[in-house]
C-alpha cells in the first residue's frame, strides 16, 4: 500500500514538474521525488494514449486508419524512439562530461512525456465533439503537446547534466543525429541478418535435395 501511495505521489509530482521543470528535474535527481517505476508507468501511459489516439480520434480529425492496424507496430515504434533517444543522449553526454546516468536520462525523458499524455488524451475527447471548422483548436493542442514536451526535454537535459543552454542545444541536435544513425545501423543489421538466413536456407535446401538423391 505504501508503494502504491508513493507512486501516486510521484505521478502528481510529474504534473508539478510539467509547470516547474527546473525545480522538478532537480528534485527528481537529487531529492528522490521520482522513481524508475513511475517513469515506466509514464512510458506505458504514453503508448496507451498513442494507441487510443490512433483508434479513438474522431473521424473528422483522424484521417484513414487501416483495418489492419497493428498496435504492436505503434508500441515498437515508440520504444525505439524512446530508447534510441536515451542511448544516443547517454553516449553524447558521456563524451561531453554530462552528470546524468543512463537511469537519469530514462527518467527525465519519461517525465517529459507528461504534457503529451494529458494533451493527447484531451485531443481524443475534443476530436469527438468538435466540428471541422474548429480544427484550429485541435491543431493548437497538437502543437502544444509537442512544444511543451520538447521544452521539458531541454529542461531535463540542462538540469540533469549541468549543461549550459548552448551545450544542451548542441547535444540535443547531435542526439537527433544519433537516433538516425542508430536507425540506419539497425536496418543494416536486419538486412544482413535476412541475407544470412536466406543463404542458410538455400544451403540447407540444397543439402537436403542432394541427400534425398
Pin down the residues of each PLM region.
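Phenylalanine-focused residue identity feature
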Residues: 8, 22-25, 61, 78-83, ...
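Compositionally biased, charge-rich terminal segments
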Residues: 1-10, 177
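Selected alpha-helical membrane-embedding segments in polytopic membrane proteins
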Residues: 6-103
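Membrane-helix interface segments in multi-pass membrane proteins
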Residues: 52-77, 123-146, 183-213
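Generic signature of intrinsically disordered, low-complexity segments enriched in small/polar residues
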Residues: 19, 28, 72, 105, ...
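Hydrophobic alpha-helical transmembrane segments and adjacent short intramembrane/lumenal linkers
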Residues: 89-184
